[in-house]
C-alpha cells in the first residue's frame, strides 16, 4: 500500500505574531515535534506544504520520505494548502493522511493506530 501524508505548515501566525512553527518549545522547533511523531516507515511520502523558507530548509534535514513543498498560493488558506499537497502527491498514492503541523503533543503511537485502522478498513 502506498500511503502518503500531507503536513499542513502554512499558517499565517497572525495571532501568534510570527511563524509559530519555528518557535521553540523546550529547545525544539514546534514543527519538529510533529515531524518526529510521524511514523515515516509507514509512509511512502510525507509532503510538508509551506510558504516558509526556514521550514523548507528544516524539512531538507529529514531523510526520505520527507519532502518540502512550497505552496504556490501562500495566502489561500488551508484549502489552498490541501490543494497544493494533493497536486504534488505521487500518482500511485492509495491514500493520504492530512496532519496539522502545530500539534506538538501528537504521539507517534496515535498516528500508528490511525494508520492501522485505515488499513484494516480497506481489507
Please give the residue ranges for each predicted region.
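Conserved N-terminal catalytic core of the sugar/cofactor nucleotidyltransferase
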Residues: 32-95
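Short glycine-rich anion-binding loops that position phosphate/pyrophosphate groups of nucleotides
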Residues: 11-13, 53, 74, 101-104
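Short, glycine/charged-enriched secondary-structure capping and boundary segments
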Residues: 20-22, 60-64, 83-84, 111-115
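Conserved beta-loop-beta/alpha segment of the NTase-like Rossmann-fold superfamily
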Residues: 76-123
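N-terminal glycine-rich phosphate-binding loop and ensuing alpha1 helix
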Residues: 1-50
Amino acid at each position: 500500500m502506498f500511503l502518503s501524508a500531507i503536513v499542513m505548515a502554512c499558517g499565517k501566525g497572525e495571532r501568534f505574531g510570527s511563524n509559530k512553527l519555528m518557535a521553540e518549545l523546550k529547545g525544539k522547533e514546534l514543527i519538529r515535534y510533529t515531524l518526529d511523531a510521524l511514523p515515516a516507515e509507514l509512509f511512502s511520502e510525507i509532503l510538508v506544504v509551506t510558504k516558509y523558507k526556514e521550514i523548507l530548509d528544516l524539512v531538507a534535514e529529514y531523510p526520505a520520505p520527507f519532502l518540502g513543498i512550497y505552496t504556490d498560493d501562500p495566502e489561500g488558506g488551508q484549502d489552498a494548502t490541501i490543494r497544493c499537497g494533493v497536486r504534488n502527491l505521487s500518482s500511485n498514492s492509495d491514500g493520504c493522511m492530512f496532519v496539522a503541523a502545530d500539534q506538538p503533543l501528537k504521539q507517534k503511537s496515535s498516528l500508528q493506530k490511525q494508520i492501522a485502522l485505515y488499513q484494516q478498513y480497506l481489507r
